[in-house]
Amino acid sequence: MKRKIRLFALVFLCSTVSLGGLWTAKNAFAKPDSPLHIDIPVKLEKANVVFDMGHLVMSTGDMPFLLGDLNLLASDFKKSGTTGNIVAVFHGDAAYLVLNDNTYNLDRRVLNDGRYNAGGHVKSGNPYAELMGELMKQGVQIELCGATARANHWGNADLLPGVKVNTDAMLRITQLEEQGYTLIYE
C-alpha cells in the first residue's frame, strides 16, 4: 500500500512539474476560459469613490488586494469614460505602502517571505512605489492619515511624491461620504 501511495505521489509530482510546477489561483487542469455574457452591464457616467485602505491583505504573491482593486477601478473608469474622483485613504497596516524607498527600508521589518526581521531593516525599497505612481498618473488621489503618520514619526519627506496627508483617516472618509462619495472598504 505504501508503495502505491509513493508511486502515486511521484506520478503526481512529475505531472505537476511538467505543467509548470506552480499552482496558481486557477486550477492547472481547468478547461480554457469559456465565452462570458454580461447580463448586467454597468455604465457609470460619473462616480466619486473613496477607498478605506487600512488593512493589508495579500493576494497570491506579494500584491495587496487593495492595490489590485484600486488599479482595476481606475482602469475601468478610464475605459468606460467615467468622470469623477477616486480617493485612496491609507492608514493603519497599509500605510507603509505610501513610504519612499529610504523610509520603507528603515521602517519595514517584515521580509518578503512574511518573517519578522527583528535585527534589521529591509533593503529592497518600496516595491509598491511604481504602482502608486501609476495610480496617481491615472488620477487617483493618494492620501495618508495624519494620525498614522504621527504615530510612526513620519514626515512629508518620508512619503512618495504626490501623496497628500489628511488630518485623520476616519474624519476624512466621513467628510468624503458626506460629500456623496461611495465608500469601498477593504
Locations of regions flagged by a protein language model:
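Secreted/extracellular ectodomain signature
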Residues: R6-F8, L22-E186
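Bacterial N-terminal signal peptides
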Residues: L10-G20
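Positively charged n-region of N-terminal signal peptides that target proteins for export
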Residues: M1-K4
